[in-house]
Amino acid sequence: MSLATEEQIGESSYVPNVDGITKISKSSFMGYLMCPRQFWWNHLADVPRPPPTEAMIRGGKVHKVMEVGLLEGADAVDRAVAEEGVDPLDPAIESMTSLLHQIAYDLGGFDIIEVEKKHQIFEKLNVAEIGKVDVIWVGMIDAVLRHPDGGLILTELKTGNMGVGKLGRTRRELCFYKMILDKMGIYEPITHFLYICPDYQLVVDREDKLLLEGSKRGKSLWLGDHNGIAILEPVGSRSLNAFEKRLNDTLPNLFSHKWDMNWNDYFCMTWCDFNSACQQELHAEELGF
């Protein structure tokens, strides 16, 4: 296991190939978990990629603003907002600034190890039912901070609203990043995950289960003035074990080129650019073709 060379990176592809070098990023892994068929459309089908949505563009800009806030302090956020062309009235900016102030105060400031640094690790991996394959693990973590009690904090910014389901998926993403840093072996142990969610809106008409996270052992929770939530939690062995099992169960399917459809009436119709093709297939199956 080693840092991937420029030659290895140039020869790699997101197309799973037992005879070549397969690139596996957090996004591609989570994408395959979400829907293997959508993964096929994104990485194997010879079709034009859809342009980024307004939400994706906004999310990228908000990430950049947070990067400046971490590196230069929350007082630098206004300048970053202007430079990135973010709407200064975007409520996420106010809530993120408030959250960063609160977190920095409680942690005694931000001791930053890295921000938005891309890692690419080459490994000869033994995959069940497949054998040895060459893999490049790819990860770019929003931020790695040092915890005041020792150990490191993996930090993830999530735009869009946040709930317990999305929190669980984000936890899996951070487990993926932890795996990469552990393989590198260059840092001290990773002990905490931090989720910063500036778009979160408090549920007022029913119990908000996300708020219960703050009462769990070892966890801390911060709320913005109007919107936004941040949660700091210890890395749990249960989450790591579940991630490892999911990874080991998924890789044989990925390298066996299994492109099953995980149809969901809401998700597919709302978020997938390729839903019409799947709808046609489902309709044909209903008709017995």
Model regions and ranges:
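Short amphipathic alpha-helical segments and their helix-coil junctions
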Residues: 13-21, 36-49, 154, 245-258
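Catalytic cores of nuclease domains that cleave nucleic-acid phosphodiester backbones
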Residues: 2-6, 68-162, 183-190, 202-203
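Metal-dependent nuclease catalytic regions and adjoining charged, substrate-binding loops involved
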Residues: 24, 124, 164-167, 182-289
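A short beta-strand motif that forms part of the nucleic acid-binding face
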Residues: 45, 157-161, 197
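An active-site-proximal "capping" alpha-helix that borders the catalytic cofactor pocket
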Residues: 170-183
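Long, acidic, intrinsically disordered low-complexity segments
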Residues: 1-24
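Active-site metal-coordination segments of metallo-dependent hydrolases
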Residues: 52-56, 163-171
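Nuclease catalytic cores
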Residues: 22, 26-74, 93, 116, ...
